[in-house]
Amino acid sequence: MAVGVNAQNKKTKSKQKPLVIETQGSFAVGGTMFTQPGNFEVANALKPDGQTLHGDHAYIFYQLPPKAHKYPLVFLHGAGQSKKTWETTPDGREGFQNIFLRRGFGVYLLDQPRRGEAGKSTVEATIKATADEQFWFTQFRIGNYPDYFPNVQFPKDKASLEQFYRQMTPNVGAFDANVVTDAVSQLFDKIGEGILITHSQGCGAGWLTAIKNDKVKAVVAYEPYSGFVFPKGELPQPINSTGLFGALSGVEIPLADFEKLTKKPIVIYYGDNIAKEPTSVWNKDHWRSGLEMARLWATAINKHGGDATVVHLPEIGINGNTHFIMSDLNNVQIADYMADWLKEKGLDK
């Protein structure tokens, strides 16, 4: 079927050919189920006794174009986010979902367990209505609130910022990397081989998924911070930072698990306004420690015979990107770089 795309912002509306989709759908994958002790009685149906609870699954929305490339793209979001990360941008342009669908890739968008449309948890949590959006504006390097960075690739109009704030969504249960990776791994079991695209907190879960499942043929990671895994005995010293989350440490895992990451190509991208040296500007220093750890991690991967590359976009002449590289004003250019990398690695057949 052909689907016309209407941008919500007329200023960014562009004339494109209709989006052609052969099939689309959605489903849940992974998760657990438990049964409350006791016996269920219809007369007392509001009591939990003897009843079941299904939860901790991921929610998947997928679209497949005609004559799709061999390997579909699986998109995993980061903290405080959902599959919306990869959909329409805050100012109404097409996101990676549509950009790569137009380029012939099947796309699978996840809401990880206990988030978004997968918001059915088997563990309890308290969700507080906390005013924190100016923190996130600063943490995600849009600027130092209320000021935008001068070269920022984020739209500076009020409506776009409101859309950005409204795409954030809470956990309904504690983040659990094992729960997340079990669900993502089961998705690959269901759909077969593919390429995992991750963002931020989702990148750590991405490494673990790639370890669990050899159907993950490659990993593209946008701005990972935590969750870098190193073989036992090779853990680097923590990297100190003035960032609000303190020093950044890696995670030690068995060598046999780490070596599974050396069997598939990996590329990591970081945006702009990241400090080169330690600084008191906490958001820039926070991401300095993440970038430094990523480089140590890639060095460890390559030392063991792997293929990991870290790309700091300003070093190749691309400036102004925020933490949300995939939805910035230059996201088509960013997609081009990812597409070129996939072609270079023989993954766009």
What are these regions (language model features)?
Residues 149, 173-195:
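Conserved acidic catalytic loop of the alpha/beta-hydrolase fold
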